[in-house]
Amino acid sequence: MARIAGVNIPTNKRVLIALQYIHGIGPKIAGEIIEKVKIAEDRRVNQLSDQEVLQIREIIDRDYVVEGDLRRETGINIKRLMDLGCYRGLRHRRGLPVRGQRTHTNARTRKGPAKAIAGKKK
């Protein structure tokens, strides 16, 4: 099992799919990494040599923000919005949808489970 960017990627999957187990790497970036290392798309992780795994690891460390660093950066950006007191920051602070979705109905994922209203019956 290869360990890249602090994540154990599955050995029996294709490299393109296995790289997507790393937070911050999707299909597009996984394809770019495979092109840079010049690996065939149908190769599986257990068929990679140690040198190829090392090259993948170096490319990810050098060119991309992934895993803990990406999570930290995202958290810092949200905290910055909340400290500024801008509209998006207020929505984050109140636990409501940030991107303009309706909240009269729906938005239960963001707002949490429904709260019972006292005295309201059919």
From Swiss-Prot:
State the source organism's domain of life.
Bacteria
* Entries under Pfam families matching the protein: Ribosomal_S13
Query: What does the entry list under GO cellular component?
Result: cytosol; small ribosomal subunit
Q: Which GO terms describe its biological process?
A: translation
- Entry keywords, A to Z: Ribonucleoprotein, Ribosomal protein, RNA-binding, rRNA-binding, tRNA-binding
Sequence segments annotated as region (Disordered): 99-122
The record, for InterPro entries, names: Rbsml_uS13_C, Ribosomal_uS13, Ribosomal_uS13-like_H2TH, Ribosomal_uS13_bac-type, Ribosomal_uS13_CS
Q: Which GO terms describe its molecular function?
A: rRNA binding; structural constituent of ribosome; tRNA binding
Gene3D superfamilies linked to this entry: 1.10.8.50, 30s ribosomal protein s13, domain 2
Q: What does this protein do?
A: Located at the top of the head of the 30S subunit, it contacts several helices of the 16S rRNA. In the 70S ribosome it contacts the 23S rRNA (bridge B1a) and protein L5 of the 50S subunit (bridge B1b), connecting the 2 subunits; these bridges are implicated in subunit movement. Contacts the tRNAs in the A and P-sites.
UniProt lists the family membership as follows: Belongs to the universal ribosomal protein uS13 family.
* Subunit field text: Part of the 30S ribosomal subunit. Forms a loose heterodimer with protein S19. Forms two bridges to the 50S subunit in the 70S ribosome.
NCBIfam families to which the protein is assigned, alphabetical: uS13_bact
**What's this protein's name?**
Small ribosomal subunit protein uS13
Its lineage reads: Bacteria, Pseudomonadati, Pseudomonadota, Alphaproteobacteria, Hyphomicrobiales
